[in-house]
Amino acid sequence: MAPLRALLSYLLPLHCALCAAAGSRTPELHLSGKLSDYGVTVPCSTDFRGRFLSHVVSGPAAASAGSMVVDTPPTLPRHSSHLRVARSPLHPGGTLWPGRVGRHSLYFNVTVFGKELHLRLRPNRRLVVPGSSVEWQEDFRELFRQPLRQECVYTGGVTGMPGAAVAISNCDGLAGLIRTDSTDFFIEPLERGQQEKEASGRTHVVYRREAVQQEWAEPDGDLHNEAFGLGDLPNLLGLVGDQLGDTERKRRHAKPGSYSIEVLLVVDDSVVRFHGKEHVQNYVLTLMNIVDEIYHDESLGVHINIALVRLIMVGYRQSLSLIERGNPSRSLEQVCRWAHSQQRQDPSHAEHHDHVVFLTRQDFGPSGYAPVTGMCHPLRSCALNHEDGFSSAFVIAHETGHVLGMEHDGQGNGCADETSLGSVMAPLVQAAFHRFHWSRCSKLELSRYLPSYDCLLDDPFDPAWPQPPELPGINYSMDEQCRFDFGSGYQTCLAFRTFEPCKQLWCSHPDNPYFCKTKKGPPLDGTECAPGKWCFKGHCIWKSPEQTYGQDGGWSSWTKFGSCSRSCGGGVRSRSRSCNNPSPAYGGRLCLGPMFEYQVCNSEECPGTYEDFRAQQCAKRNSYYVHQNAKHSWVPYEPDDDAQKCELICQSADTGDVVFMNQVVHDGTRCSYRDPYSVCARGECVPVGCDKEVGSMKADDKCGVCGGDNSHCRTVKGTLGKASKQAGALKLVQIPAGARHIQIEALEKSPHRIVVKNQVTGSFILNPKGKEATSRTFTAMGLEWEDAVEDAKESLKTSGPLPEAIAILALPPTEGGPRSSLAYKYVIHEDLLPLIGSNNVLLEEMDTYEWALKSWAPCSKACGGGIQFTKYGCRRRRDHHMVQRHLCDHKKRPKPIRRRCNQHPCSQPVWVTEEWGACSRSCGKLGVQTRGIQCLLPLSNGTHKVMPAKACAGDRPEARRPCLRVPCPAQWRLGAWSQCSATCGEGIQQRQVVCRTNANSLGHCEGDRPDTVQVCSLPACGGNHQNSTVRADVWELGTPEGQWVPQSEPLHPINKISSTEPCTGDRSVFCQMEVLDRYCSIPGYHRLCCVSCIKKASGPNPGPDPGPTSLPPFSTPGSPLPGPQDPADAAEPPGKPTGSEDHQHGRATQLPGALDTSSPGTQHPFAPETPIPGASWSISPTTPGGLPWGWTQTPTPVPEDKGQPGEDLRHPGTSLPAASPVT
């Protein structure tokens, strides 16, 4: 057994196997496997006082999915990926748990790391909006939809912890956040879907936030405005800007000072598969319940509700298409675009959302990604979040904070000091801190932007809401618990037998049955431990349906008082009772009240000289207690800590060392030298009054009369001065026994030392050898003395009373030393007055008291006329010192005086507006400006007090308005010049010129349109060749709107043809087109079309030459190749660009782009169906839809040895070089 015990002493940590596939029969354990520390607990349901009711903690919502509306497209094929519709099983046994019907609050006891917490919960009725739904989608189509319910979401607090907060759901066990006064905890059931076995207890896992070993949002994991790359969205933003500026949502308005973020929650397939289809809805509701509680934290400074209006579960293929792994920017862009398409267009629709939260387990990069100040914007109010357990709630809160306008703490602001304390907006949102809070910078930034978010002013809730649910019951077996704790295959250990199977759960694997493991925790309450028995609170008890739970303990009767601890000098005796009538059982409470009761006994003084009882206990150790290899003379020492008053602590009179004797003082020992009556008993201080009654509050007056009024007290004081005539101490004065409040002090600097001697015993208690005095506190004669030395003058004080008379002596340094002078004073009862010497002055202490006006009570009203009364106190007439009121005669107390106060009229809170801020845009349709608005109450001192919005009368002034919504000015944009059209001599170059706005749309530009064509000069051509020049003309191209605008294109460079070459006929089918006759003045074109040009020069051409290469012209009505507007066009000098009037006046030219095919009536017959910028366009007489000029980047080369341009006889045509596109 020894080796076995050795092996068992090294226990393996908890290993949790997560079942990621939905519908698997393997138990799902919702432990991440990343916990550095955790605890196991079995919560129970209690009443409002914390008394045990049941181990059933789950509500019925998990067992019933409610009514479901299936809306499946009729053509959608049904396959294995379709979701099952959950049935609504009957409650087990058909009965309801007592006390659950109609309950509005729930109470649970949860043990968290050894500390039992009593949770007080109420339904969170403002998390799910009435009329909201949950949808299941696949391939961007809705499979089915059902109402979204929140019947088991609760918030609340912890009894006895004012700053605690709880956000928990009990759909399937207790799951959520418990925030205590020191740290934050998460709780969740060890295994899901086990409600039917819960009746006798269910194990839950509790872990601190800092136990989650992971990092959340990275510093660069948040998308700011300038980095929000949604591709080419300017036009789309312009469209939604119209809706944003012109559409006003008509919704129910929230209460002033309250805001609601209506959230569309989207969960992709990776989250659904991880948590399971049956559990994911309850899980995400719990997650958002925690987010809602985070935004309710008082450090935020404003009340913000998280309201779910819609839940969408996204299918597998759709999830993959929305999230691009490793690319957060692209993923967020796609999610925001898709979420915008899901928006309900009707602003009054119950599912119209303000903000989108997307949850995924796919690795898109950081833990969160969101645009800053995107709230209420149709495209930018969205956040992408990586889901990784309940800690993801803080990622969601962090990213939503960015969308609300909050920046990272410490980045550009002065809140870096709060990041280590757990601020929600820390750059690294880690779980390494105990309690979350919103930093002062987050609070300030939110207050700056919040007034401009009009969409958050809606109140989406109706007053009526469903009642909280019923609670069913569930349980587990020991083998199942072993599998939960250590993995598949583990079962109850049978290697050894134990008489207490419910003390600890031992498990082993069949592969090694003699190697047993345990978590050192008991099996769950209700686990079967023997036939007919189950485990409960670590004990194996009989099962019984009438089993009594939560049996509180009760006291037995008191025993008789025992013997007194001392025979004289004041002792104690005690009696006791037991908590066994009945004994606490089954989680019941212990008995309340003390177990022992004490009485003071034998309080008369002991005969003989006075002996300090505590000093006697220290002195007994003088003979045998060795400290540092030596024996000492021990005297009592009183510590400053009240908790150590009844411990025996002694001080060495030789060395001053203080030693704890590791035992308590004897019963009846005084607790403190400052308290003459309270005594120690069983190591605790028992308060005793001056009447010797335990627990009495009676006290002595100044001269020791119990409950007296100082009327019998006398003060004796005097001044003494004597010169020493011989060596030795000089006796100055004797103070009698019973004296109190003794003060002795030297009147001037003197080398004398004060010496105190006990007149009865003759022993010295202070400076017996005249050592140099030092300031110290010591005990003697059962009293505490304070010896102080300041500026060479010594003083001695004690509160008394003196048990025996003392003598005050002065010890000079040498014989015949200087005169010593002392002043002394003490208080004594008149019956104990000594004979008064000539140097003593007896003062009357018959202090009389009177009622005196102390102050005026606060005014009943701050303004508008109030009433206040006088407050009287008890005052001593002699020195007008205020004393306790019981010293004055209550019968003589005067009646209060009444007077009016605060007669000034009350000021009313008013709305105060700040100046309008700068416009967010200089032009366009999205310009808005905001201003701050506060409800302020003017105060009489000229300041103002911030009041809640509901305190101000009238409607809240406008905080946001449109501004500068004018069209943005357009500018000319120029392309690069093309290559020269000629290879030698003179040619032309062309560029594109377009009129565009900043949004990249067409606009109206001021001023003349820049030139699109210019002349280029190259070295002259050699030989007999003439310079080939080509001039550009204006052609028309189709725009996406179906209009035709001028477009200038240069001709293709033409190879040189010898002027001596005879004219044998036209060399291109285009020579027959009259529209090209204007180019006959160009030598190159003249050689190409010599026959047509000669005919044009000789007169009107009756028709085309029927040559073998001639083809009939194909000009048609509406052709994009119009001829010259007048004859002057043909006579224009070569090389000068020509164009239409529109072109000359700077009319905008549309770049080649997609054509609008939705209007066939405006489609040109030569316009291509799918034009591609940069591709070659060509014309064919046999192919309709071609354009006469091609766009190409490389002109077709022509062999130098042939004197004709390169043409394809099958598709005759001439190509033009393309100009560079405008950027």
Swiss-Prot record:
Residues 23-252 form a propeptide. Glycans are attached at N109, N475, N941, N1027. The keyword Protease applies. It holds the Pfam family ADAMTS_spacer1. It is found in: Secreted, Extracellular space, Extracellular matrix. SUPFAM superfamilies: Metalloproteases ('zincins'), catalytic domain, TSP-1 type 1 repeat. Residues 552-607, 847-907, 908-967, 968-1022 form the TSP type-1 domain. The keyword Zinc applies. Disulfide bonds join C336-C382, C376-C455, C415-C441, C482-C507, C493-C516, C502-C535, C529-C540, C564-C601, C568-C606, C579-C591, C980-C1016, C984-C1021, C995-C1005. Residues 461-551 form the Disintegrin domain. This is A disintegrin and metalloproteinase with thrombospondin motifs 14. The lineage of its organism: Eukaryota, Metazoa, Chordata, Craniata, Vertebrata.
